[in-house]
Amino acid sequence: MEAISLFSPFFFITLFLGFFITLLIKRSSRSSVHKQQVLLASLPPSPPRLPLIGNIHQLVGGNPHRILLQLARTHGPLICLRLGQVDQVVASSVEAVEEIIKRHDLKFADRPRDLTFSRIFFYDGNAVVMTPYGGEWKQMRKIYAMELLNSRRVKSFAAIREDVARKLTGEIAHKAFAQTPVINLSEMVMSMINAIVIRVAFGDKCKQQAYFLHLVKEAMSYVSSFSVADMYPSLKFLDTLTGLKSKLEGVHGKLDKVFDEIIAQRQAALAAEQAEEDLIIDVLLKLKDEGNQEFPITYTSVKAIVMEIFLAGTETSSSVIDWVMSELIKNPKAMEKVQKEMREAMQGKTKLEESDIPKFSYLNLVIKETLRLHPPGPLLFPRECRETCEVMGYRVPAGARLLINAFALSRDEKYWGSDAESFKPERFEGISVDFKGSNFEFMPFGAGRRICPGMTFGISSVEVALAHLLFHFDWQLPQGMKIEDLDMMEVSGMSATRRSPLLVLAKLIIPLP
């Protein structure tokens, strides 16, 4: 299905209609204009703005995180864009982010409450990622930490991850000996991550699996859709006019119906004591039935959390794997080094298990370096300022949205050196910099109260997939294609995925068990 984008002619028609309506309803006096100019002067610096649209035009024609990085280099590490009717503050330096997280994390702990996609697909704030800060969010966050994705439960999913990874290597081995051996690795990795998530969420006997994944893929196609109402909150009807709202609600309605069927199946299995595994949906249903939460867990809550895990967790994990393989193919010395380490550490064993992964220290460095160059969310999920505060000497008004440009932080030469744009896993040797939120120059999963609750779960899937791919196979580009021909540009959506799929040839080196 076609999504409305910044490049759609219909978008511009709708946008200019919005401008016309805004002009009709706008009331201002000379005194209010003067007051607005005084307030504007105390905001962070801004690129030149156009009437009514503000800085929207400057974000057209490229990936927003790259455009914002260039704007930061011109106008400073903390800038304020006017996107329609919304003030959007963008932090692009370690110093700015450190001040925000250390001094004002609570003031920036909120999420925008009226974003069209999250309002519809996350059931109007019934999960964690896009839920506004407050008691209900704290409860949901605790459920994630204590019940759903704690280290013990993530480890309990090891057998599922290993089984899915072995099936993936089997499919790749089969394709490697086919008449047309070129493999779309991006597609296969995405299918693998989907399979892991659906099994830990619903089990391997989910009758609706294929249809559900089809709907999730359709939902993901709308993530980067441009919502006029997100930038003009007073003109929400424009999303109805463009057809975006009806498309989102149509896909969501189908997903909601599938959720109802899956919940009914799991409830029947639990009642008959036929549930073979303690799945994510089982845990949530038990919490709902116990009814001892301050904020009651409802069927809507259950569906919102599972939806969140799928939409926020599948594409991000698969994109990390995709980028690791891309960087290793483009850097054959690093590829040789990581494979040599793994194959020597296995000492002749052919069956790789998760318990072997801690032996692969260079793989850990490779993953870190890939997360630095290709953070899955280059622009962290937007926050909203709960009360007016001062950051780097500038006033950030209550209600302003905040974007942290993780892409810019991880390319800051002040912290990463003059070779910050280069793939160099060795830069992480002997240093304590990690991605768990304490190092502001490297925060692909966020930091503070809003750090990603599924980080451990996602990284575990990434590690087991890469370990199997690199241990069993040698990789190269299709015949006639040179390393310098490999497209390394990204497109923005729920995460920054490859602009073009990774097409490769695989050669089986270590026999499959």
Curated annotation (Swiss-Prot):
GO biological process, one term: sesquiterpene biosynthetic process
Amino-acid positions noted as binding heme in the UniProt annotation, renumbered to this chain: C452
Membrane-spanning intervals of the chain: 4-24
Keyword Membrane: yes
Pfam families: p450 (PF00067)
Location of the protein in the cell: Membrane
Reaction equation(s) it catalyzes: alpha-humulene + reduced [NADPH--hemoprotein reductase] + O2 = 10-hydroxy-alpha-humulene + oxidized [NADPH--hemoprotein reductase] + H2O + H(+)
Topology term for the membrane: Single-pass type II membrane protein
Origin: domain of life: Eukaryota
Keyword terms: Glycoprotein, Heme, Iron, Membrane, Metal-binding, Monooxygenase, Oxidoreductase, Signal-anchor, Transmembrane, Transmembrane helix
One GO CC annotation: membrane
Glycosylation sites (chain numbering): N184
InterPro entries hit by this protein: Cyt_P450, Cyt_P450_CS, Cyt_P450_E_grp-I, Cyt_P450_sf
Cofactor dependency: heme
EC id: 1.14.14.113
One function term, GO molecular function aspect: heme binding
Free-text tissue specificity from the UniProt record: Expressed at highest level in rhizomes and much less in leaves. Not expressed in stems.
Note: The recommended numbering of humulene gives 10-hydroxy-alpha-humulene as the product rather than 8-hydroxy-alpha-humulene as used by the literature.
Similarity comment: family membership: Belongs to the cytochrome P450 family.
Role of this protein: Catalyzes the conversion of alpha-humulene to 10-hydroxy-alpha-humulene in the second step of zerumbone biosynthesis, a predominating potential multi-anticancer agent.
Protein name per the record: Alpha-humulene 10-hydroxylase
Lineage: Eukaryota, Viridiplantae, Streptophyta, Embryophyta, Tracheophyta
Gene responsible for this protein: CYP71BA1
